Amino acid sequence: MGSDLKARLKAKFSRRSSTSGSVKSGHSHSHGETQLSQRDESRSLASTDNHSRPASVRLDPQSSSNLGAPAPAPDADEVPVRIVISPEDSTATSSSTASTLPSEEVQPQESVTRDPSSQLSAAPKRRAASDGPGNDLHHPMAATTSSLASINENQTLVDASIAASPPATKLPPSVSTSARNTAASSAAAAAAASAAVAVTAAAAAADPDNDDDDDDHLDPLHRGPAASDVLTPAPATAPAPVPATLSASSIARPTGPPRRQSLLPNRQDALIKTLLQAANINEADLTADHLLSINANMVTRKIWVKRAGASATLITINEDDLVDDVRDMILKKYTNSLGRHFDAPDLTLRIFPREERQERLLGPEEPMGRTIDAYFPGGQTVDEALVIDIPTRRTPRPSPRGAVSHPTAVYYAHDTGRPSEAGEGYFPPVGAIPSPNLEVPGAAPNGGPPPPHAIHIQHTGHLPHSISILGTGQVPPIPSPGRSHAYKTRPNRPQLGRTHTSSPTFINGVPSNVGGPPTAHPVHSSFHPRLPPSRTQSNASAESAAIVPPAPPLATPPAPEIPSAIQRISTPPPRIASPRPSSARPARKKIAPAHPVLPAGMLAGGVPPINVLIVEDNPINLKLLEAFVKRLKVRWKTAMNGRDAVKKWKGGGFHLVLMDIQLPIMNGLDATKEIRRLERVNSIGVFSSSASGVFSGSVTSEPEGTEGDIEDKDRLANIELFKSPVIIVALTASSLQSDRHEALAAGCNDFLTKPVNFVWLERKVMEWGCMQALIDFDGWRQWKDFAQDAEENDAAKKAAGVKAKSKKNRLSVTTAAA
């Protein structure tokens, strides 16, 4: 009986070993060698004497005494499983004990007594104990990589490998043996298979009559999944393997499409750089190719500049601009005051450092941004603005006390009171002081003695008064525009007192020409301190007693210490060629204005009172033109659009039309074309049939042939009032040459650009009035009489109004007294 059971067990063990090897080889090819080494070590431990084994795998005396003896049949509910685990290395002991494979000489190391009926019921319990994902105490890969440390191995390496593995959780003693087996390391897959073989051998020994059923029940090929469910815990879902190191390319930002337009303005380069640098702080490896290149002209800043004694202003410059570039920006900011008169290279910039250092001029090659940062580290304030210097005008001033080589140059030689270019005013704020050089030679043109200023040249030796005579030899007379005798009245203005080392002292009256006629030359006398005593005092008393000239009508207030003779001598002299003091006196009553105008009554007496038609849609401009023509004492009528202008022109009697181009209903050009068409149809002016024989050909025959064909709407009622074509002047705000050509082509005689210069327009009115007078001389005579009668009537009406007003005032006074 015992020998038969032993033979059957050997056959089963041999079959199980082959089956277990095939199952283990199916897990992983890479762990086959590890399982073979574990098997050899287990055999060596099994064949070793119990006293020679390590303490962790040594069997207790009871288990060692029962080796090789058949186990008694246990009870139905008692399945004791006893495993000796050393507390020092529980994982290694479990692996070494469970991975021991049976052989002919090796006995089971665990005393397992299990009933066949309870074997099936234990499987669900073990399955339930290993269901949770947290019950697996080891990594699922550790089951194939863990191996039993041999006796001859280096224990330090084994301990290092154990320390590298996750720590095992110690279970309390109340946990069952199956739970402890489940909580063991998942690296003991081979040990679980050996335990299954031991349990099968014990069951076969208990029931020897059920061999075939046991073989089928314990066959791993038939119940492979069940055996793994019973003895192997379910591994938890393993996370995806994470590489230890990540490459920079794997986390680099993907390259998107190129940015076509920046979200920020191109001058905010500092902000763009800051944002890009802040975004790249946490980047692993971001190459420069992923970023857009930034232009240098995007960097801008503002600096303070000002003119000397003026308010400061800000200008925008680039970061890399030089001082020469900044000067261009300054001219753009100062467009009117500097840009009209100076170029950028003419300007200079001065900088005032914060320290007690001297100011300095900035060179055109210096970088503006770096200079500002160097001198003003904390930033430039408005009080530290750069000062803009402009070049001083190098116009040569006339040299004082110079000789004048031309008689008419005396007026310009003493014109020291002219307003300066800086604009201090027309009249300098100085009292009336007679100029010591105001001398006009009276006998020089007639071959008389030399003038007094020639003697002055001998004593002073100065250069001529005007620097312009160096090239021409004389100073040509340049009278004021529009005034033929303006040079005589201009010295009436107060003269600017010049302070020189040779300042003259005022003495009594001195004649400028001894022996000359006393009636023609007393006004030419002047004071001069350098004249010889014999010439300056010979006839002074006689002339001063004989001549007592009256004071001029518009003489300036004299100084209190200067006598009347000095006042008379300080008046300007008349023209040299015609010494007529009586005729020159009335001319002193008027001062030449900036724009010379005609006298108030000149048009009324010299030009016929023409009739003007004003066509303007703007009421303000219309009122201005009405006031203008009213001041000229001419007749006028107004129209607000082109259609009314044509309708009023048909009434006749107009000589001048001021036509605005931009008009409602009918514009100015269309109205002009209509007026010219009606003039041509009605044969007015040069189209008349009564013209000279030159127009007896085809030019005049056409109006004669078409005279009877004139429509009623085109026929003029008062044809006798149309003596000549009317003068049409276009008024427009456009200054384009094309608009001018278009207006002239439509039939306009002239073209005026708004705003209109009324002085120029007054002259044009006189010109156009003279043209009308030449065309119709008889009518002009009648118009003149009519104008005189109208003036007389107006004067009578004004006198009557004044008389009535005075009478009314007297009545009111008497009534109040009563």
Curated annotation (Swiss-Prot):
* Sites bearing 4-aspartylphosphate, chain numbering: D660
Could you tell me the Gene Ontology terms of the biological process aspect for this record? phosphorelay signal transduction system
Q: Which InterPro entries match?
A: 2C_system_His_kinase (IPR050956), CheY-like_superfamily (IPR011006), Sig_transdc_resp-reg_receiver (IPR001789)
Does the keyword Phosphoprotein feature in the UniProt annotation?
A: yes
Effect of loss of the gene: Increases the sensitivity to various stresses, including oxidative stress conferred by H(2)O(2) and sodium nitroprusside dihydrate. Confers higher resistance to fungicides such as fludioxonil and iprodione. Results in significant down-regulation of melanin biosynthesis-related genes but does not affect microsclerotial development. Impairs phosphorylation of HOG1 under the treatment of sorbitol. Severely attenuates fungal virulence on tobacco seedlings.
Keywords (A to Z) from UniProt: Cytoplasm, Phosphoprotein, Two-component regulatory system, Virulence
The subcellular location is: Cytoplasm
Give the SUPFAM superfamilies listed for this entry.
CheY-like (SSF52172)
PROSITE patterns, sorted: RESPONSE_REGULATORY
Going by the entry's taxonomy, the superkingdom of the source organism is recorded as Eukaryota
What residue stretches are annotated with the Response regulatory domain? 611-769
Task: Give the record's family classification.
Answer: Belongs to the SSK1 family.
Outline what the protein does: Two-domain response regulator protein in the two-component signal transduction system of the HOG1 pathway. Modulates stress response, melanin biosynthesis and virulence via its regulation of the phosphorylation of HOG1.
Q: What's the protein name? A: Response regulator SSK1
Give the organism, scientific name.
Verticillium dahliae (strain VdLs.17 / ATCC MYA-4575 / FGSC 10137)
